[in-house]
Amino acid sequence: MKILVPATSANLGPGFDCLGLSLKLFNETQIQKSGVFSISIGGEGSDNIFLKKNNIFVNIFYEIYEKLSGKKDNFRFIFQNNIPLSRGLGSSSAVIVGAIASAYYMSGFKVEKECILDEALIYENHPDNIAPATLGGFVCSLVEKNKVYSIKKEIDKDLAAVVVIPNLAMSTEQSRQALAKNLSFNDAVFNLSHASFLTACFLEKKYEFLKFASQDKLHEINRMKNLPELFEVQKFALENKALMSTLSGSGSSFFSLAFKDDALALAKKIQTKFKDFRVQYLEFDDNGFEIC
């Protein structure tokens, strides 16, 4: 079997831990039953020995597979990782979702996306990345009694993303330590209103309001202080036809959304100005993970 799992960008400014969308940048994993266990890694993380010795995908896969099938089989895993690691593009969610869905498939169980999403919550306790990685599109999610509830909206084909990827790894745990311990009532109301309005903008295609709807007072500023150049990236993107520009997940990547006609030019301009960063033009994925 082969499974493709997309990269994701979460939070989208004010939608902390509840909003996310799916990008056409995929981790690809092939799994075959084998007489002996083996693992091969290409792309991102291919030079990381730890990923071979203690691979999270493999660990979760075997845990779920043995629980479902009652068997202890050996498998050959071939990874082609295209999602940058620890850059705020959902690399850990792609691993979790991919491992669970693969285990269900190889165990002979029906792969139901709602079931996969609830199972993924065991390994990642916020749904902002795992939901779009599973469902695709723009997704608003919440957790109620250990169950994920999500509403998905397909993203217009005339929109595209420009993702700026610094050479700075940043784990979610590390990034959360930078968050303020207390929040004022006014700032809480600010984020609630902006996250709600941002969601409505995607649902009703009111893209002209995204620039101010995507503002945040909860997490972005504190996280971006780890890499001050990101403030310049955001300002530059918004001055050059980005409809919105936000920290991607916990960082360090930065996500901008624009009309396709503007996005490619924006990517080139950002790459010219910020030569030390990797810049990618990406379209949006509306399917979530796919088993081939």
UniProtKB/Swiss-Prot annotation:
Pathway assigned to this chain's UniProt record: Amino-acid biosynthesis; L-threonine biosynthesis; L-threonine from L-aspartate: step 4/5
Keyword Nucleotide-binding annotated: yes
Q: Which GO terms describe its biological process?
A: threonine biosynthetic process
Source species, domain of life: Bacteria
GO CC terms for this protein? cytoplasm
| Chemical reaction(s) catalysed | L-homoserine + ATP = O-phospho-L-homoserine + ADP + H(+)
Record localization: Cytoplasm
**EC number(s) given by UniProt:** 2.7.1.39
Q: Which GO terms describe its molecular function?
A: ATP binding; homoserine kinase activity
* Assigned keywords, A-Z: Amino-acid biosynthesis, ATP-binding, Cytoplasm, Kinase, Nucleotide-binding, Threonine biosynthesis, Transferase
Which positions are annotated as binding ATP? 84-94
What broad class describes the main subcellular location of this protein? Answer: cytoplasm
Q: What does this protein do?
A: Catalyzes the ATP-dependent phosphorylation of L-homoserine to L-homoserine phosphate.
Annotated family: Belongs to the GHMP kinase family. Homoserine kinase subfamily.
> How is this protein named in the record?
Homoserine kinase
Organism the protein comes from: Campylobacter jejuni subsp. jejuni serotype O:2 (strain ATCC 700819 / NCTC 11168)
